[in-house]
């Protein structure tokens, strides 16, 4: 295997597993209100026990945030028994957590099903001309705070995505697939459930966006999902995506590749609000019944919190109080080491306004102020740059995340670093193990022009900008 690509010994999909039937009955769906999308319908319909209203006084709920009662109740034993049987059956399969062939591809993968081509990279390049590249239209950026800009950007992203055309023709289509593969690997390796401590395998997705990681949650076999994001239209899209896949092929004799986990979604800012204050007004009793969780995930988002130390501490409070002991905090962020190398090696250029920047045809980083010559940012917070990624991020403010600062702060919140690697290293070291497990369309979407798999050209540098990390709650 070369250092920047992978050539498989066999084609993907030769040992594909099917996801087991859902153990939950189909829920009714009601329109979202108050900026919140719920996976549950009318109050008259029966809800899973972890979302039933707790009739006891929930004053002081924040003190209970790190506790959780046993989820077993007399009325739910039969459901939990069924759940355990299904999970045990899945565990006996050779490739646990493997996605099925149909119906569960990530957004951006589905259009690829209808392409007949020996080399996907060729078709991808030929059809890009019919695709509308994303451009945000955010006015008066100079006088808006970062929350306002980020919310507006991702809401516009959600709105425009439906008019852009097939995402298989996006100029960063292969890069999206590469990044998705990295997240599958991170979650597949580090998302662990402890059935002796918690009955249900639970997942808290901070900054969930449009629900791009829902398929990954099905892949790792979770039982319950909670998604929070600052962009209300993205939350609505995530909810619709979940309910569509939840309903898909629900008749037992058609197809089992639908979501088998329950989910709820809420709009909120996990950098300035505490999780109970976001969830409790809309789902009374959820903190008592659904927390702590096994995994907290923050994908491509934590860097927004480094605007200030207060925001980072609020985020880490949410993470540590949400996690059970032994639970994992899994995320992806820009690499401060990568940024430092660009500065120290003098790879910076000047834009038309004289601001320092680096990048290529796919991405760019433009600093608000000249960065320090040694690449070490002091103080560690508020070091802003504008990030541009073709067809995805349109010069949105982000902040440098000095990783040692993050690691040190995490230790204050009982979060110990277990893993940190660049996307390039993760791919090179882990893709051989995952090549036959991941969905064939996702794998095909990473096929290079030379027939190998991985990033090529300007994509190499764009993906090397990121790292994956895992912290464990002790």
From Swiss-Prot:
Compositionally skewed regions (Polar residues) per UniProt: 1-12
InterPro entries for this protein: mRNA_G-N7_MeTrfase_dom, mRNA_G-N7_MeTrfase_euk, RG7MT1, SAM-dependent_MTases_sf
Site residues (mRNA cap binding), renumbered to this chain: 210, 216, 241, 303, 398, 466
Any one of the GO CC terms: nucleus
Organism superkingdom: Eukaryota
Record's catalysed reaction(s): a 5'-end (5'-triphosphoguanosine)-ribonucleoside in mRNA + S-adenosyl-L-methionine = a 5'-end (N(7)-methyl 5'-triphosphoguanosine)-ribonucleoside in mRNA + S-adenosyl-L-homocysteine
EC number, as in UniProt: 2.1.1.56
CDD domains the record matches: AdoMet_MTases
GO annotation terms (biological process): 7-methylguanosine mRNA capping
Compartments reported by the entry: Nucleus
SUPFAM superfamilies reported for this sequence: S-adenosyl-L-methionine-dependent methyltransferases
Keywords, comma-separated and alphabetical: Methyltransferase, mRNA capping, mRNA processing, Nucleus, RNA-binding, S-adenosyl-L-methionine, Transferase
Function: Responsible for methylating the 5'-cap structure of mRNAs.
Family, per entry: Belongs to the class I-like SAM-binding methyltransferase superfamily. mRNA cap 0 methyltransferase family.
Protein name: mRNA cap guanine-N(7) methyltransferase
Organism in which the protein naturally occurs: Candida albicans (strain SC5314 / ATCC MYA-2876)
């Amino acid at each position: 295997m070369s250092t920047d690509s992978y050539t498989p010994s066999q084609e993907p999909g030769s040992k594909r597993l099917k996801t087991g039937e859902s153990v939950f009955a189909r829920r009714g769906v009601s329109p979202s209100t108050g900026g919140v999308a719920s996976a549950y319908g009318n109050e008259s319909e029966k809800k899973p026990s972890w979302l039933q209203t707790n009739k006891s006084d929930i004053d002081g709920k924040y003190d209970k945030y790190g506790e959780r009662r046993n989820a077993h109740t007399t009325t739910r034993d039969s459901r939990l028994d069924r759940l355990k049987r299904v999970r045990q059956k899945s565990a006996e399969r050779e490739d646990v957590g493997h996605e099925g062939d149909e119906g569960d591809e990530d957004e951006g993968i589905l259009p690829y099903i209808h392409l007949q081509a020996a080399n996907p990279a060729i078709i991808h390049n030929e059809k890009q001309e019919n695709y509308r590249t994303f451009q945000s239209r955010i006015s008066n950026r100079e006088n808006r705070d970062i929350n306002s800009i980020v919310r507006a950007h991702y809401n516009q992203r959600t709105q425009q995505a439906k008019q852009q055309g097939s995402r298989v023709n996006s100029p960063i289509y292969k890069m999206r697939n590469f990044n998705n593969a990295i997240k599958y690997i991170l979650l597949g390796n580090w998302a662990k459930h402890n059935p002796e401590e918690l009955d249900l395998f639970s997942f808290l997705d901070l900054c969930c966006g449009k629900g791009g990681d829902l398929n990954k949650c099905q892949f790792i076999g979770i039982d319950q999902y909670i998604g929070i994001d600052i962009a209300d239209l993205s939350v609505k899209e995530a909810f619709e995506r979940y309910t569509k896949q939840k309903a898909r092929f629900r008749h037992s004799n058609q197809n089992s590749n639908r979501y088998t986990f329950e989910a709820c979604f809420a709009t909120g800012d996990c950098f300035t609000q505490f999780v109970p204050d976001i969830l409790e007004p809309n789902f009374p009793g959820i903190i008592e019944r659904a927390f702590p969780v096994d995994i907290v995930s923050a994908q491509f988002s934590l860097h927004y919190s480094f605007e200030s130390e207060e925001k980072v501490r609020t985020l880490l409070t949410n993470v540590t109080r949400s996690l059970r002991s032994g639970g994992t905090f899994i995320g992806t962020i820009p690499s401060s080491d990568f940024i430092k190398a660009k500065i120290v090696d003098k790879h910076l250029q000047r834009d038309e306004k004289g601001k320092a920047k680096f990048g290529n045809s796919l991405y760019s980083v433009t600093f608000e102020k000249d960065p320090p010559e040694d690449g070490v940012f002091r103080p560690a917070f508020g070091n802003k740059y504008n990030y541009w990624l073709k067809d995805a991020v349109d010069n949105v403010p982000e902040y440098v995340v000095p990783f040692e600062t993050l690691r040190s702060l995490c230790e204050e919140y009982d979060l110990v670093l277990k893993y940190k690697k660049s996307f390039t290293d993760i791919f090179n070291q882990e893709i051989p193990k995952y090549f036959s497990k991941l969905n064939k369309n996702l794998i095909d979407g990473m096929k290079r022009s030379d027939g190998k798999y991985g990033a090529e050209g300007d994509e190499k540098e764009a993906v090397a900008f990121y790292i994956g990390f895992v912290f464990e709650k002790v």
